[in-house]
Amino acid sequence: MGNLKSVGQEPGPPCGLGLGLGLGLCGKQGPASPAPEPSRAPAPATPHAPDHSPAPNSPTLTRPPEGPKFPRVKNWELGSITYDTLCAQSQQDGPCTPRCCLGSLVLPRKLQTRPSPGPPPAEQLLSQARDFINQYYSSIKRSGSQAHEERLQEVEAEVASTGTYHLRESELVFGAKQAWRNAPRCVGRIQWGKLQVFDARDCSSAQEMFTYICNHIKYATNRGNLRSAITVFPQRAPGRGDFRIWNSQLVRYAGYRQQDGSVRGDPANVEITELCIQHGWTPGNGRFDVLPLLLQAPDEAPELFVLPPELVLEVPLEHPTLEWFAALGLRWYALPAVSNMLLEIGGLEFSAAPFSGWYMSTEIGTRNLCDPHRYNILEDVAVCMDLDTRTTSSLWKDKAAVEINLAVLHSFQLAKVTIVDHHAATVSFMKHLDNEQKARGGCPADWAWIVPPISGSLTPVFHQEMVNYILSPAFRYQPDPWKGSATKGAGITRKKTFKEVANAVKISASLMGTLMAKRVKATILYASETGRAQSYAQQLGRLFRKAFDPRVLCMDEYDVVSLEHEALVLVVTSTFGNGDPPENGESFAAALMEMSGPYNSSPRPEQHKSYKIRFNSVSCSDPLVSSWRRKRKESSNTDSAGALGTLRFCVFGLGSRAYPHFCAFARAVDTRLEELGGERLLQLGQGDELCGQEEAFRGWAKAAFQASCETFCVGEEAKAAAQDIFSPKRSWKRQRYRLSTQAEGLQLLPGLIHVHRRKMFQATVLSVENLQSSKSTRATILVRLDTAGQEGLQYQPGDHIGICPPNRPGLVEALLSRVEDPPPPTESVAVEQLEKGSPGGPPPSWVRDPRLPPCTLRQALTFFLDITSPPSPRLLRLLSTLAEEPSEQQELETLSQDPRRYEEWKWFRCPTLLEVLEQFPSVALPAPLLLTQLPLLQPRYYSVSSAPNAHPGEVHLTVAVLAYRTQDGLGPLHYGVCSTWLSQLKTGDPVPCFIRGAPSFRLPPDPYVPCILVGPGTGIAPFRGFWQERLHDIESKGLQPAPMTLVFGCRCSQLDHLYRDEVQDAQERGVFGRVLTAFSREPDSPKTYVQDILRTELAAEVHRVLCLERGHMFVCGDVTMATSVLQTVQRILATEGDMELDEAGDVIGVLRDQQRYHEDIFGLTLRTQEVTSRIRTQSFSLQERHLRGAVPWAFDPPGPDTPGP
C-alpha cells in the first residue's frame, strides 16, 4: 500500500503511507520550468499529451488551440510534457499567497481542520455532498440514473431535517479509497484500490474503539504480510464532542525525558508519553517501549488501553555483512498506522479514522533512526564503521545512512515483513502518475514529500514536475485533542488491559446486540437451475454466521458494482447446458465480463465477446488467462490494484462430469474475479452430482470458512464449533418447526411463481400425438400447446420451454400414508420456524418459512416438492435421527457418511423417497420435515419444436416418454415425471410453462449461409423449428436460402424415424439439400451413428462449410453424442485441412467464439449401462485419487485424455 505515516510529528518526506498533505500549486520544490505562465490545454476530458522527446533540453511542444488554462507539467529526464486538467476540480485554495509560497511548510495553518463551534452551513454541506454523490455514481457508471437522483433527494432531505447526513457503506468505502488516491504527499498511492475499509460507525464507547483498533492491527499486520486498512469511527456531529485517538500512530515508541534534558526512546513522542503517564500508565525505561493508546469517546475523558504484546509485530535490526550492527539493539515496529488525521468525505468529517499500510525503508532507516531530533544514531554507526566524522567531505553521513537503510531492508525481508525500498516506491509512483493522467487527467502531488530523503536525483520522481492541489474526499490535519478548549473531561483514568476489555465485552448484554454489526461482512452469491446451489449457499450462510455477518443473495438480486466495495464474497453456482450460467446468473455474468481488470484494462472487443460467449473456454490453459495470471504473480505492492483490489473470494461449482463443460460457469467466475484483482482465498471447489457432490461441498465449505477466518483474523473460537455445523442435529430439530393453519387456499400459477421466483404462464393442450410406430415399445410424443398469444410465451426457433409438472397422484398418496402427523387433507398450512432470541434483543418468536405458499400437504407434495429423486446424504443423515430401529439408523448413517457406498446405493436403486421409507420402515416422517427439507420440484426443459411464423399462438414440444426399471432391470418401474404427465394430457388441459431463450442456438440472420444440422432422436426437436422458419422464408418472403444439410439418427426406419414425412416435404420444397439418416438397430445393417455419417459421407462438406464458406454447424442431443460428434469434427478438420489435431481443436474454439459451432446439450437420456458405467468410473477414479492425497473438492485441470472444462 505504500507508506502511511503520522505527519504531525515527523516533518519532511513521508514514510508509512506518506499521507502528508502539503498543498498549493507552488508547493513544488523541483527544478524550475522555463515556462513562466501556464499554457493553454484542451478541456479536462481530453488532456493534451505531446509526443515524448528523448532530448530533455529541447522537447517539442505543440501548443494546443484556445482553451482553458491548465498547468503544463514536464518530466526533465524524458522531456515529456502533459497538462494537469484534474486540478480544475479542486474546490479549496492552497496555503500559498500571491506573494509567498508556503509549499514547504509541514503544517500550514490553513490546512488544519479545526472543530467549528456550530454545524456547517446547510448550503455548504449540501454543495460538498452533491459533489461527492456525483463522484460516486459516476464511478459506478450510474450517473444521471434514477437511483442517482433519488439518492441526491434523500441527502437533501436528511440535511434539511437534521443538519447532516449519513453515508451508505458503499459510499464510505469509495470515499475512503478516494481520500487516499487524492493524498498529495503519498508516494504509494498506486495501491489505493486495495484499501480494506472497516466500518466502525456504530461504535459508542472507548472500549469499543479499542476492540475495533485491536482487530485493525491484527488484520493489517497479518503475521508480517501487511495489508492496507482503515477503520472509520462515527462522524463529527453538531452539538457533540468527537471520537479521537490521541496517539499520532497506533503503534509508537515512548520517549522519556531525562533529568539532564536528554530523551531516552523516541524524542518525537515525549508529549504523548507524559500524557499516558498522567492517565495511569506505568512506564518502562527502554528505548523501544510500545506506548499505550489514549482513546476518547464524545464528551468523555480519554481512557488508556495497553496493547497486548502479541498484537505488535517488531523487527530486530541487523546488517547482512556488519556483524556488530545487531549489538546496537535497534528494532522497529512493522505497522505504520496513522491515527490522528481527519477523514473528510462529502463535507462529513471523521475525526477518528486510523489507517495503515507498510513502510518505505527510508522512513525508518533515514528519518526515524538518523534524524537529529529522533533516535540520531548516524554518528554512532559511522564510528563503528571507522569513518572519518571530523569532516563532511568524507561523506560519512551518506555512507552510514546507506548502511542503516540496508540493515532495515535486510532485517524486514529476513523477518518476512512487508517493506518497500525508495527506488521501487518512486518507480511505482511514476506508474501511478501515468495511470492517473490517463484516467483523470492529472494527479495532485507534493514534490517535496514525494522525493525520498536519500538518493534524491537517483529516483525518477526528482525529475518530474508535479502540481499540488486539494481534492475531496481527503485526509486532513487536525489539532491535537489535548490542546485548546475543545477537550472535555480532564480526569485521570486507570489503565485497562486488553483482557479486561475483552471480558467486559464478553459479559455485557448491552453490547451483544452490536457484536454482529462489528463482524466482517460476507456476501454469499448463488445461481441455480435446480435449487441445489441455493440450498448449499444457505448452508454456507449458517456456517459463516459463526464468525462473520453474512448475507445470502441470488445473483440476479445483486448489483455487480457492489463487488468493488466488498471484503469477502463466496460464490456457489451450477452450470447450465453447454457451459452457460444458470438463468438467474446471466445478468451477473454479463456485468462481470464487462468489468475491466488491472491486466486487461483495454481488452479488444473480440476478447470481450469471446469471454462473454464461451464460459467453458475460461480455463487455466487459455493464453489470455495465462498471460495476466503470469503478470499477477510478478506483481507486488508497487503495482496497480484492480477494480476488485480489496475483494477476497472463494468459488464452488456444482455440475456433472457427464457434461463436457463440467462446472464451466464456476470456473469462469473464479477466473474472472482473480483477473479483476480479487484475491482467491481457496482453490476452486467442484462437486460432481454423479459422485460425492455433498461431501465435496462440506469439505470445501469448512476449508473456505477456515481460510476466511485466518484472512480476516476472526473466529478463533468458532472454528471448532464449525466442525459439526453440517450435523443433522444442528440443521433440523423437530421442536423448532410447527404447522400453522392458513385461511387462503392455493392458486397454482401464483404458487409456482412464488416457489420458482420467475414469471410463469399457462398454456393449454391442443393435442398430444405419438410419433413412433404402434409396434415400438417406446414412445416419443409431439405436444402442441396454445399460448393464447401471451407475450411471455413468445419465442424464436432454438429456444427452450420450461414445463412445471406435478408428481404422480399414486406416489403422493402412498407418501401421505407414511406421514406421522398429517394436517387435515383440505387444510392449507404454512411452516413456522422458531427464531432464537438474543440477550438485549427481541425474544424468541415463530417466523413463517417463506419457501412454499400456503397450501395443503397434498398440494405441496404434488406441485412443489421433489419426491422422486434419490435423497441426498444430508437428508439421509437427518432420516437416521428419526429411525427407531438401531440397525436402520446405523445403515442410514453409513450411507450418509460413506460417499462410495452412497453412490453405489443411489445408482443401483435410484430410489424415490417412498422406496427409501419402504427400505427403512422405522423412520418417522413429520410433516414439517417434508415441507422444509425436501428439494423443490424443478421445471423440465425441452427444445421448442416449432416456428412462431409457421404456427402463430402455438408452441410445440418433442418429448421422449421415459420409463425404466432400476436394479439392473429387476427393480420397480420408474417413470419420467414430466414426460409421463405430458403423455397423459388431454385437449384443453392447462400446462404451467415459461420460455427460456437460447441466443447461442439460433439460425444465422443471413439465410444464404450454409448450415449442417446434426440431431439423433429427440435431438431433431429444435431443427423442426428451423425448417419451419426456412419454409416461411421461402413461401412468404420469396427468399431462396442456402439449402441446409440434416443428419438424423434413430434405431429403426420402421419404428422411430421421427418427422420423416415433414423432412421429406421440406427437402422437396428447397429447405434441405441433403438429408442423411443413421440407423443404429436397422435389421440386416451394421450399427451406424450420426458421427459415422459425418466421417464417411460428409467430411469434405463439413470442412468446406466451416472453414471455407463461414457456415454454421448445429448439434443437438445428449452429452455422449455431442462429445463424439465434436471429436469427429475435430478429426475431419485435421484430415481435410491438413493440420495437427491440436490445431483443429483451436479452429473449433474459434468457431465457438464466432458462434458458428452451436451445441444444445442435454444430460443422460436413459440409465444405460454403457453411459453410466463410463461416467461413474471416471468420477470414482477422481474421488479415489483425491482420497490418496488431494482435497476431494479441488479443481482438476483437464488431462490429455479428458475433455476440457
UniProtKB/Swiss-Prot annotation:
Its EC number is 1.14.13.39. The modification Phosphothreonine is found at residues 497, 1177. It is found in: Cell membrane; Membrane, Caveola; Cytoplasm, Cytoskeleton; Golgi apparatus. A lipid is attached at residue 2 (N-myristoyl glycine). Residues 758-1004 form the FAD-binding FR-type domain. GO terms for cellular component: caveola; cytoskeleton; cytosol; Golgi apparatus; nucleus; plasma membrane. Phosphorylation by AMPK at Ser-1179 in the presence of Ca(2+)-calmodulin (CaM) activates activity. In absence of Ca(2+)-calmodulin, AMPK also phosphorylates Thr-497, resulting in inhibition of activity. Phosphorylation of Ser-116 by CDK5 reduces activity. Residues 15-27 have a biased composition (Gly residues). Keywords: Blood coagulation, Calcium, Calmodulin-binding, Cell membrane, Cytoplasm, Cytoskeleton, FAD, Flavoprotein, FMN, Golgi apparatus, Heme, Hemostasis, Iron, Lipoprotein, Membrane, Metal-binding, Myristate, NADP, Oxidoreductase, Palmitate, Phosphoprotein, Zinc. A lipid is attached at residues 15, 26 (S-palmitoyl cysteine). NADP(+) binds at residues 778, 1018, 1051, 1080-1081, 1087, 1089, 1091. Zn(2+) binds at residues 96, 101. One of its GO terms (molecular function) is flavin adenine dinucleotide binding. Its cofactor is heme b; FAD; FMN; (6R)-L-erythro-5,6,7,8-tetrahydrobiopterin. FMN binds at residues 528-530, 532, 574-575, 656, 663, 689, 693. Its main location: membrane. FAD binds at residues 800, 940, 942-943, 958, 960, 964, 977-979. L-arginine binds at residues 249, 358-359, 363, 368. Homodimer. Interacts with NOSIP and NOSTRIN. Interacts with HSP90AB1. Forms a complex with ASL, ASS1 and SLC7A1; the complex regulates cell-autonomous L-arginine synthesis and citrulline recycling while channeling extracellular L-arginine to nitric oxide synthesis pathway. Produces nitric oxide (NO) which is implicated in vascular smooth muscle relaxation through a cGMP-mediated signal transduction pathway. NO mediates vascular endothelial growth factor (VEGF)-induced angiogenesis in coronary vessels and promotes blood clotting through the activation of platelets. Belongs to the NOS family. This is Nitric oxide synthase 3. It comes from Bos taurus. The lineage of its organism: Eukaryota, Metazoa, Chordata, Craniata, Vertebrata.
